[in-house]
Amino acid sequence: MSWVWLLVGCSGKPSRNNQPAVKSDSASITQGAQTISVHAQDTICHLPVATQSVKDSVFTEQELQKIQNELRKRYARSEIEGTRLDGNISGSGIKGNHLVVNLCLNSPEARAVFRKKVMDSPAIRFEGPIEPTPNNQRYTSDTLGIHLYPEFSAYPYTAHTATFVLFNQSEHEIGCGDPYRITYENQHGVWRTLPINTNFHCVGYIIKPGKQFLFKAHLNPNVLPNRPGRYRFFYEVELTDKKQKIMLMTEFRLADIKEAVRDSSDVISVEYR
């Protein structure tokens, strides 16, 4: 399997878990002299004709490599800023008889933008969750003299980033990196994982006792427009002398406001359930 990551980071290797084979979701439809690429997860009403014969195409390794090279060139010059594809592609590579494109959120809108703005080919198969996965995990924001807080208690729901502060009031040096996770509570009160790109730079930071660390997290609103409500930010640190890993979590809010505020009590009124 040949693999190339469009965004290189710590999680840059594809999963090799023994999962059931996934049927190709790319197929070619011939309508007269025109060949059209479709997706099995897109409903039949989105197709150009009412009835057609769909057949999986098989490509050689050499053909896939040529398509992959062309994909890199087209992606580099594609105009996807502000679309559902912006920040959504985590990688691509040859897998079996197809060129697989991994999406943070494998939505019909993202696939449509890819075909229009980047490449439309029956060789391409899209992988990734079709909806945000449930995630009700919780951790503390304060332990052993280590504290994690949002810089502001509320950010505009249209914001692309949120900032967080890590305070080290312990007697230990703590190590940390770029990786983080975010979950959100939807309108039904169910917590789900926010679809963000989890390819992070492999860098490390040392926070000495008595120091603090300010960092930024991307909210990826182009992939899935965020709603006003409650969000959780997860961040792992390590006591360097003890090699002890600690997962921290802090809550923050997105609200219908123009600028971030430190006290959200007067600007937020969100009903859940």
Question: Where do the model's predicted regions map?
Answer:
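Short glycine/threonine-rich beta-strand-turn micro-motifs
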Residues: 21-24, 28-62, 80-115
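Primarily secretory-pathway and cell-envelope proteins
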Residues: 131-201, 206, 236-273
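Bacterial signal peptide processing site
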Residues: 11-14
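A short tyrosine-centered beta-strand micro-motif
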Residues: 212, 227-237
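Short proline/glycine- and acidic-rich turn/helix-capping motifs at secondary-structure junctions
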Residues: 51-68, 125-136
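A mature extracytoplasmic/lumenal domain signature
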Residues: 58, 103-107, 170, 178-180, ...
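C-terminal motif of bacterial Sec signal peptides marking the signal peptidase cleavage site
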Residues: 7-9
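Intrinsically disordered, low-complexity Pro/Gly/Ser/Thr-rich segments with frequent PxxP/GP/PP motifs
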Residues: 197-224
